[in-house]
C-alpha cells in the first residue's frame, strides 16, 4: 500500500486501487494499438498480487508505522509479484508477459528507463532478486513467440505500462505542495513531461484521447503511529472511511 504521511496521520492508497487508476489511464490513451485490450488488462491488474498483502498489512518494524510498499521485505515483494504474474497470465497471456516484464523491471531500474528506482533492502538479498529477474527473463522469448508478438511491439507496450504505472503513482502519492516535475520515457524515444499545477497535474505532450482527465483516488486516513501490533493497524484500516481525492490531468495551456 502507498503510505503518505500527513502530520500525525497517514493517507493510504491501496496498491490495487493504484493499479485500477493505471488501467483508467490506459483506457484514455490516444493512438492505435493492436494489443490495446491486453495493455489495459496489464495496467489494471499489474499489482493484483498485492491484494494478498493488503488483506493482512503489517507495521514497519523499524518505525512501527504502516509499511509503505517500497519498504516491504524483498522476499515478500517477490512472492507477491509471482502470484500476480500467474493471476494475470491466466486471464490474458499477453498481459501476463507485460506484468512479468514490469515486475522484473522494478529491480532493474525499469530496464534503464528509471535508473534512480531503488527498493529498500534489495541489495541485502541481491541473489534472490537476481534469481527472480532471471526466472522472468527466461520465459520472455517462448511466451512472445507463442503470442506471435515482435520484440519491438512488446517493448513499446512495456514502456507504455511504465508510463501508466508512474503517472498513477504520482497521482496517488499526491502532495498539496506539489512534487517536482517528472519525466517518463515514451516509445519512439519521446519523453512525457509531468508537472504539478496546484493539486492537479499538467502533461506534455498531451497523450490522451480526451481534453482533460479527472481521476478519483480512493484514500483512507489513519493514525501514523500508536499501533500496538499488526492487528491494530488492520483494524484501523478496516474502520477508516473511504474518501476520494480528485486529481485532474490537463494539457499545458
Q: Predicted segments — roles?
A:
Residues 2-13, 23-24, 39-174:
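Divalent metal-dependent catalytic cores for phosphoryl transfer on phosphate-bearing substrates
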Residues 6-9, 22, 34, 61-63, ...:
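Residue-identity detector for threonine
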Residues 16-30:
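An active-site-proximal "capping" alpha-helix that borders the catalytic cofactor pocket
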Residues 31-32, 36-37:
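Short, surface-exposed loop/strand segments
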Residues 120-253:
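Non-catalytic terminal regions of proteins
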Amino acid at each position: 500500500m502507498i503510505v503518505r504521511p500527513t502530520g500525525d496521520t497517514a493517507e493510504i492508497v491501496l496498491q490495487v486501487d493504484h493499479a485500477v487508476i493505471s488501467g483508467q489511464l490506459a483506457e484514455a490513451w490516444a493512438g492505435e494499438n493492436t494489443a490495446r485490450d491486453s495493455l489495459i488488462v496489464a495496467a489494471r491488474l499489474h499489482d493484483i498480487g498485492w491484494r494478498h498483502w493488503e488483506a493482512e498489512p503489517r507495521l514497519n518494524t523499524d518505525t512501527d508505522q504502516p509499511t509503505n510498499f517500497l519498504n516491504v521485505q524483498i522476499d515478500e515483494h517477490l512472492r507477491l509479484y509471482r502470484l500476480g504474474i500467474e493471476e494475470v497470465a491466466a486471464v490474458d497471456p499477453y498481459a501476463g508477459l507485460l506484468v512479468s516484464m514490469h515486475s522484473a523491471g522494478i529491480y532493474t531500474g525499469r530496464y534503464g528507463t528509471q535508473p534512480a528506482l531503488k527498493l529498500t533492502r534489495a541489495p541485502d538479498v541481491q541473489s534472490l532478486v537476481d534469481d527472480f529477474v532471471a526466472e522472468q527473463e527466461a520465459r520472455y522469448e517462448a511466451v512472445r513467440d507463442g503470442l506471435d508478438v515482435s520484440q519491438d511491439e512488446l517493448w513499446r507496450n512495456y514502456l507504455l505500462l511504465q508510463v501508466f504505472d508512474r503517472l498513477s503513482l504520482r497521482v496517488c502519492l499526491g502532495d498539496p505542495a506539489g512534487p517536482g516535475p517528472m519525466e517518463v520515457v515514451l516509445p519512439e524515444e519521446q519523453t512525457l513531461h509531468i508537472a504539478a499545477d496546484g493539486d492537479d497535474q499538467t502533461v506534455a505532450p498531451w497523450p490522451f484521447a480526451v481534453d482533460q482527465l479527472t481521476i478519483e483516488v480512493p484514500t483512507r486516513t489513519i493514525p501514523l503511529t500508536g499501533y500496538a501490533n499488526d492487528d491494530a493497524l488492520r483494524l484501523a484500516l478496516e474502520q477508516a472511511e473511504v474518501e476520494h481525492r480528485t486529481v485532474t490531468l490537463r494539457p499545458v495551456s
